[in-house]
């Protein structure tokens, strides 16, 4: 990922709801205090505090989650990185070698993942075994039983349903390829400048419910901004309904998380002998230091924690889907598949035990008609953001941008499907609520990225402790 898709975080309006008090900072403060002194206590619109999240994530969840994400089921992600940008034509492709993505060869992918039936449970796999050679899942063989045809068509309909928050890739396209996420990690790539700024600017300016008259703090594509614009922006933000305010904070948190990754896996040394990746303290400070960012950095970090709570809550709500006996993490290796499902359920039950979950019941409450319209606006705005990922000029940035937006979109889909999840049958096909393998892989990897960001904040806090 790019230097500074990346440096954008210094400029673009990642937001929180606290006012800035950095004009009163004293020179004697440490660098850690300038980045983290206001990243503590309770989060806005939540009943949870930063310290509780740190303890839960760093010591109870993070190690097990990383082990799960290293398994075959979660490391291989099918993606189309050749889809054209739907919004503009002048994309400048990053030519740096670190922007490139190395796709998998066919023989590197487990057979169970390559088969068309990987999306479904073991019971469903048996039902649709005869259709694996169909060009698309919807092309149902007429010789199949009526029950099987119904199941396949229901799944196809579901995958294209209006409940989805993302513009899904056509993974049957010849341009779609499997990528090993462990061999193509999210890190600094050198992608920077106006092309990268443009992506985030379009996201914030056109898809976050913000009128053009309201100026975001530290926007590199706007000039002449000052304290009055910042005050106007936060007055506007605080006046939004909780749903729109949350939407902005989710995008801000995602942006902040990406920048933590880039600072933590920065190219420190590049010689013909080796490349050395590690923590770049200066880059982290440029993005999150309270003085250098005029108070924006700590706000952005708090929004990262807000994003963490939203995705954590979604995982706690979807436990019944994964507990169903016919669900499996199907790769074709029965022993490993069973072990990984046990690990998955262990992680999900740990998440469910978290004492201070976000309460999503405040979302889309009130008048039903207005709530439904707001929910649809929410969904369409996020879906548009997922389409913007096809405009990113750095392929590795595009890969991780698409995965993380799909993961967040899947989390939102789960949060707004509570009744459907509650009504799922204990066994057999679930027609009303379903997750594809793409959604499952993106959901857990996206949360893994946020979990990693929270863990890296502890590392940066320690590194900055003795720096002034």
From Swiss-Prot:
Signal sequence segment: 1-23
GO molecular function: FAD binding; oxidoreductase activity; protein-disulfide reductase activity; thiol oxidase activity
PTM per Swiss-Prot/TrEMBL: The Cys-94/Cys-99 and Cys-394/Cys-397 disulfide bonds constitute the redox-active center. The Cys-94/Cys-99 disulfide bond may accept electron from P4HB and funnel them to the active site disulfide Cys-394/Cys-397. The regulatory Cys-99/Cys-104 disulfide bond stabilizes the other regulatory bond Cys-94/Cys-131. Phosphorylated on Ser-145 by FAM20C in the Golgi which increases its enzymatic activity. Phosphorylation is induced by lactation. It is also induced by hypoxia and reductive stress.
Disulfide-linked positions: 35-48, 37-46, 85-391, 94-99, 94-131, 99-104, 208-241, 394-397
This protein's encoding gene: ERO1A
Task of the protein: Oxidoreductase involved in disulfide bond formation in the endoplasmic reticulum. Efficiently reoxidizes P4HB/PDI, the enzyme catalyzing protein disulfide formation, in order to allow P4HB to sustain additional rounds of disulfide formation. Following P4HB reoxidation, passes its electrons to molecular oxygen via FAD, leading to the production of reactive oxygen species (ROS) in the cell. Required for the proper folding of immunoglobulins. Plays an important role in ER stress-induced, CHOP-dependent apoptosis by activating the inositol 1,4,5-trisphosphate receptor IP3R1.
Binding site for FAD: 187, 189, 200, 252, 255, 287, 300
Essential cofactor(s): FAD
Membrane disposition: Peripheral membrane protein
BP term (GO), one: protein folding in endoplasmic reticulum
Family of the protein in this entry: Belongs to the EROs family.
Known EC number: 1.8.4.-
A Pfam short name: ERO1
Keywords of the record: Apoptosis, Cell projection, Disulfide bond, Electron transport, Endoplasmic reticulum, FAD, Flavoprotein, Glycoprotein, Golgi apparatus, Membrane, Oxidoreductase, Phosphoprotein, Redox-active center, Secreted, Signal, Transport
Enzyme class: oxidoreductase
Protein name: ERO1-like protein alpha
Superkingdom field: Eukaryota
Subunit structure: Predominantly monomer. May function both as a monomer and a homodimer. Interacts with PDILT. Interacts with ERP44; the interaction results in retention of ERO1A in the endoplasmic reticulum.
Organism: Sus scrofa
Regulation: Enzyme activity is tightly regulated to prevent the accumulation of reactive oxygen species in the endoplasmic reticulum. Reversibly down-regulated by the formation of disulfide bonds between the active site Cys-94 and Cys-131, and between Cys-99 and Cys-104. Glutathione may be required to regulate its activity in the endoplasmic reticulum.
Residues with the Phosphoserine modification: 106, 143, 145
Gene Ontology cellular-component terms listed: dendrite; endoplasmic reticulum; endoplasmic reticulum membrane; extracellular space; Golgi lumen
Sites where a glycan is attached: 280, 384
Alphabetized InterPro entries for the sequence: Ero1, ERO1-like_sf
Subcellular location: Endoplasmic reticulum membrane; Golgi apparatus lumen; Secreted; Cell projection, Dendrite
């Amino acid at each position: 990922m790019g230097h500074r898709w990346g440096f954008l975080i210094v400029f673009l309006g990642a937001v929180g709801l606290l006012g800035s008090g950095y004009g009163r900072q004293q020179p004697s403060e440490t660098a850690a205090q300038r980045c983290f002194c206001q990243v503590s206590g309770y989060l806005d619109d939540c009943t949870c505090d930063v310290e509780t999240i740190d303890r839960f994530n760093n010591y109870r969840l993070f190690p097990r989650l990383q082990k799960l994400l290293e398994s075959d089921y979660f490391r291989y992600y099918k993606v189309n990185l050749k889809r054209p940008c739907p919004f503009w034509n002048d994309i400048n492709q990053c030519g740096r070698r670190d922007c490139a993505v190395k796709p998998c060869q066919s023989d590197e992918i487990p057979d169970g993942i390559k088969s068309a039936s990987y999306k479904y449970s073991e019971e469903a796999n048996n039902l649709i075994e005869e259709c694996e050679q169909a060009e698309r899942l919807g092309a149902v063989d007429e010789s199949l039983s009526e029950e099987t045809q119904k199941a396949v068509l229901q799944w196809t309909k579901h995958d294209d349903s209006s409940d989805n928050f993302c513009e899904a890739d056509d993974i049957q396209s010849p341009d779609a390829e499997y990528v090993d996420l462990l061999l193509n990690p999210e890190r600094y790539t050198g992608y920077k400048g106006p092309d990268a700024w443009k992506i985030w600017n379009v996201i914030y300016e056109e898809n976050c419910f913000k009128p053009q008259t309201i100026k975001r703090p530290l926007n590199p594509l706007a000039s002449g901004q000052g304290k009055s614009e910042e005050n106007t922006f936060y007055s506007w933000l605080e006046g939004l309904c909780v749903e729109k305010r949350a939407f902005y904070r989710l995008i801000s948190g995602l942006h902040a998380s990406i920048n933590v990754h880039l600072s933590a896996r920065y190219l420190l040394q590049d010689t013909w002998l080796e490349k050395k990746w590690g923590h770049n303290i200066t880059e982290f400070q440029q993005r999150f230091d309270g003085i250098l960012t005029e108070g924006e950095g700590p706000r952005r970090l708090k929004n990262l924690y807000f994003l963490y709570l939203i995705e954590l809550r979604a995982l706690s709500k979807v436990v019944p889907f994964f507990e169903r006996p016919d669900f499996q993490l199907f790769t074709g290796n029965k022993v490993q598949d069973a072990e990984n499902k046990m690990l998955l359920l262990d992680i999900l039950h740990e998440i469910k035990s978290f004492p201070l979950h976000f309460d999503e019941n405040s979302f889309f409450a009130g008048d039903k008609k207005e709530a439904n319209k707001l929910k649809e606006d929410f969904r369409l705005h996020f879906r548009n953001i997922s389409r913007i990922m096809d405009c990113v000029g750095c392929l590795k940035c595009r890969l991780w941008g698409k995965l993380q937006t799909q993961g967040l979109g899947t989390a939102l889909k789960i949060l707004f499907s509570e009744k459907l999840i509650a009504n799922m049958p204990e066994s057999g096909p679930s027609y009303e609520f379903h997750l594809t393998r793409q959604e499952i892989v993106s959901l857990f990897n996206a949360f893994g990225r946020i979990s990693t960001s929270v863990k890296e904040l502890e590392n940066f806090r320690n590194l900055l402790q003795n720096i002034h």
